From Swiss-Prot:
Cofactor binding remark: Binds 1 Mg(2+) ion per subunit.
Gene Ontology molecular function terms on file: adenylosuccinate synthase activity; GTP binding; magnesium ion binding
SUPFAM superfamilies, sorted: P-loop containing nucleoside triphosphate hydrolases (SSF52540)
Function: Plays an important role in the de novo pathway of purine nucleotide biosynthesis. Catalyzes the first committed step in the biosynthesis of AMP from IMP.
Cross-referenced Gene3D superfamilies: Adenylosuccinate Synthetase, subunit A, domain 1, Adenylosuccinate Synthetase, subunit A, domain 2, Adenylosuccinate Synthetase, subunit A, domain 3
Family assignment from sequence similarity: Belongs to the adenylosuccinate synthetase family.
Subunit structure: Homodimer.
Protein's GO biological process: 'de novo' AMP biosynthetic process; IMP metabolic process
Binding site for IMP: D13, E14, G15, K16, N38, A39, G40, H41, T127, R141, Q222, T237, R301
Protein name per UniProt: Adenylosuccinate synthetase
Biological source species: Leuconostoc mesenteroides subsp. mesenteroides (strain ATCC 8293 / DSM 20343 / BCRC 11652 / CCM 1803 / JCM 6124 / NCDO 523 / NBRC 100496 / NCIMB 8023 / NCTC 12954 / NRRL B-1118 / 37Y)
Residues that bind GTP: 12-18, 40-42, 303, 329-331, 411-413
Subcellular location field: Cytoplasm
Gene: purA
Keyword list, A-Z: Cytoplasm, GTP-binding, Ligase, Magnesium, Metal-binding, Nucleotide-binding, Purine biosynthesis
Lineage, highest ranks first: Bacteria, Bacillati, Bacillota, Bacilli, Lactobacillales
Length: 427
């Protein structure tokens, strides 16, 4: 076994990128297996900060393959722009590899996403980047894949077949303007020409890597609670950020996975609409939001803030089979007199320990908290677990106990040197 999956285990924005970086330091490949450029991740490489949404985190690490798997939906324009941006920061992208089976986000996906969200009375807070419509076309078997994009003849044939229906939706259903075939064709054929050198059968490539016992890191976007099957449906993304998404989104088997690392923050945040049982609407939320810089990488929207939710996290442990835990942003809680962890819910007088499937349950849900003493010390220069204030140590230990998952690391700031390991990343 040579594969490690790094899974966001809340509602995204947990700091997965820097944990991926730890594994990537001694890995041969880093693979993004789902999502699109709707999910931003911030990583540090030396003193350089990278805000990525289309490229895998491993792109900044020399010597590793940075792979976009078949489960990713790709906006060629955004991807090429991000390539140009990282190159301007001194990164070369010859290690980038794109699956020929990945689906392409087309202009009509973005137009339909924007029109649908604007017209809906029940908005789910989409980033309006065409992710959902692209996945819809994939499931409906009317999508355009990267293999099609890099073949102008096939691409033109498919675009000519699909565009009239998409234009009918835009004009007749939403009253929007129709899109022009020639404009799309010319632009996307050029995108295909530029991306073609990076395209291959990534499932075959990964199979060869793992046969040779190479170390491979699988990087999820978003988080478990946004999974289309296991998240707070319908307020979810359109793919599977859970560990199970790797099998379909990268084309590898479960026997090839050694560990599943769940990444969380020491509190909870969420962007967009949907249930959030531990959400705060007070000065504590404002404190955490400002100290933690809780604004979306892509959307720049202020994130919703709440206490850590062990009920939701136990759900993440169950559906992704977490074997290790990486806890980020512990420093953000410094200065609070007390910190809380949700340990169960009460619904209609009954205590429950599972995360509800029905959105209606959350309207009558009470949250049961365990309160622990906080700490005042600045911990951003701490380098070892036993250097933390005893209350911070106890907080981390309690999280591990409640989830029954061993702690891999804790972070006291955003930079790589502020993340500290309690055990080796590769065992």
């Amino acid at each position: 076994m040579s594969g490690v999956i790094v899974v966001g285990s809340q509602w995204g924005d947990e700091g997965k990128g820097k944990i991926v970086d730890f594994f990537a330091e001694h890995a041969d490949a880093v693979v993004r297996y789902q999502g699109g450029n709707n999910a931003g991740h911030t990583i540090w490489h030396g003193d350089t900060k990278f805000e990525l949404s289309a490229l895998p985190s491993g792109i900044v690490t020399k010597g590793q393959l940075a792979i976009l798997g078949n489960g990713v939906v790709i906006n060629p324009e955004a991807l090429l722009a991000e390539i140009k941006e990282v190159e301007s920061q001194g990164v070369t992208v010859e290690n980038l590899i794109i699956s020929n089976r990945a689906h392409v986000i087309m202009p009509y996906h973005i137009a339909l996403d924007k029109a649908s969200e604007t017209a809906s009375n029940n908005r789910i807070g989409t980033t309006k980047k065409g992710i959902g419509p692209a996945y819809t076309d994939k499931i409906s078997r009317v999508g355009i894949r990267v293999a099609d994009l890099i073949d102008p003849e096939i691409f033109g044939k498919l675009l000519k077949e699909y565009l009239p229906f998409k234009n009918a939706q835009l004009t007749k259903l939403y009253g929007e303007e129709a899109l022009d075939y020639n404009e799309i064709y010319d632009k996307y054929v050029e995108y295909g020409r530029q991306l073609a050198p990076y395209v291959t059968d990534t499932s075959y490539l990964l199979g060869q890597q793992m046969k040779e016992n190479k170390r491979v890191v699988f990087e999820g976007a978003q988080g478990v609670m946004l999974d289309v099957d296991h998240g707070t449906y319908p307020f979810v993304t359109s793919s599977n950020p859970t560990a199970g998404g790797v099998m379909n989104g990268a084309g590898v088997g479960p026997k090839q996975i050694q560990d599943v690392v769940g990444v969380i923050k020491a509190y909870t945040s969420r962007v967009g609409s949907g249930p959030f049982p531990t959400e705060l609407f007070n000065d504590t939320a404002d404190h955490i939001r400002e100290i933690g810089h809780e604004y979306g990488v892509v959307t720049k929207r202020p994130r919703r803030i709440g206490w850590l939710d062990a009920v939701a996290l136990r759900h993440a442990v169950q559906v992704s089979g977490l074997t290790k835990l990486a806890i980020n942003s512990l420093d953000v809680l410094s200065g609070l007199k007390e910190v809380k962890i949700a340990t169960s819910y009460t619904y209609k007088g009954e205590e429950i320990h599972h995360f509800p499937a029905s959105d209606t349950w959350f309207q009558g849900l009470d949250v049961n908290f365990e309160t622990l003493p906080g700490w005042d010390e600045d911990i951003t220069d701490v380098t070892k677990f036993d250097e933390l204030p005893i209350n911070a140590q106890n907080y981390l230990k309690r999280i591990s106990e409640l989830l029954e998952v061993d702690l891999l690391s804790f972070a006291v700031g955003p930079k790589p040197e502020q993340t500290h390991l309690l055990r080796p990343v590769w065992e």
